Amino acid sequence: MGERIRGLYLVTPDAADSATLLASVERVLPARPALLQYRNKLADPLRQLDEARSLRQLCSSAGVPLIINDDVALARAVAADGVHLGRDDGSPAAARAVLGADALIGVSCYDEWVRAEDAAAAGADYVAFGAMFPSSTKPGAVRAPLTLLTRARAALDCPVAAIGGITLDNAPALIEAGADLLAVISDVFAAADPLQRALAYSALFA
């Protein structure tokens, strides 16, 4: 990746139906998040494909890169900008072989420094640590210390993402510790005014 990407990294919420999901995303895209990740652990593959295609169109129109969670094949099928890999989703090199040299490939590193080193060495475009705080999306997720963000920012060439339980109140501490990207679901999409909340996050990076 060229210029170091920084800002709000929006992750889609679980939604009862596709229309609700797409309306929620369309509402916040004017905030121009740095990235938008499509994450849906509940839908069947056909619905995932339909939603990802629709999100691709919305994101392309808004100039926001679309990342697909955990599914290289789906990312390729909809010509997404990249993929986010978890523990069992393969290597950055394998994903790049499928998606191409320009794909944005992120890797979940949880609280594991060695995993982050390995991911960066394998060509990851960003590494993600978390949960940084208790998370309603993943209540049992392992907690990662803020010191990992600082260490990664100093030692790795790729951007550093923080995820898990992030709010406007704790976000400044994460940025100060070294986070380039703040991955947020609930604190934006469950807000009374999601667009204004997203804009408030983006302003933290101004």
UniProtKB/Swiss-Prot annotation:
Taxonomic classification: Bacteria, Pseudomonadati, Pseudomonadota, Betaproteobacteria, Rhodocyclales
Residue positions annotated to bind 4-amino-2-methyl-5-(diphosphooxymethyl)pyrimidine are Q37, Y38, R39, N40, K41, N69, S108, K138
- Cofactor entry: Mg(2+)
Q: Entry's PANTHER family?
A: THIAMINE-PHOSPHATE PYROPHOSPHORYLASE, THIAMINE-PHOSPHATE SYNTHASE
Keywords, A to Z, come to:
Magnesium, Metal-binding, Thiamine biosynthesis, Transferase
InterPro entries associated with the record = Aldolase_TIM (IPR013785), ThiamineP_synth_sf (IPR036206), ThiamineP_synth_TenI (IPR022998), TMP_synthase (IPR034291)
Catalyses which reaction? 2-[(2R,5Z)-2-carboxy-4-methylthiazol-5(2H)-ylidene]ethyl phosphate + 4-amino-2-methyl-5-(diphosphooxymethyl)pyrimidine + 2 H(+) = thiamine phosphate + CO2 + diphosphate; 2-(2-carboxy-4-methylthiazol-5-yl)ethyl phosphate + 4-amino-2-methyl-5-(diphosphooxymethyl)pyrimidine + 2 H(+) = thiamine phosphate + CO2 + diphosphate; 4-methyl-5-(2-phosphooxyethyl)-thiazole + 4-amino-2-methyl-5-(diphosphooxymethyl)pyrimidine + H(+) = thiamine phosphate + diphosphate
Q: Which Enzyme Commission number(s) are on file for it?
A: 2.5.1.3
Per the UniProt record, the source organism is Azoarcus sp. (strain BH72)
| Function summary | Condenses 4-methyl-5-(beta-hydroxyethyl)thiazole monophosphate (THZ-P) and 2-methyl-4-amino-5-hydroxymethyl pyrimidine pyrophosphate (HMP-PP) to form thiamine monophosphate (TMP).
Instruction: Please give the pathway this protein is involved in.
Output: Cofactor biosynthesis; thiamine diphosphate biosynthesis; thiamine phosphate from 4-amino-2-methyl-5-diphosphomethylpyrimidine and 4-methyl-5-(2-phosphoethyl)-thiazole: step 1/1
GO BP field: thiamine biosynthetic process; thiamine diphosphate biosynthetic process
Binding note for cofactor:
Binds 1 Mg(2+) ion per subunit.
The similarity comment for this entry is: Belongs to the thiamine-phosphate synthase family.
Any GO MF annotation of the entry: magnesium ion binding
What name does this protein carry?
Thiamine-phosphate synthase
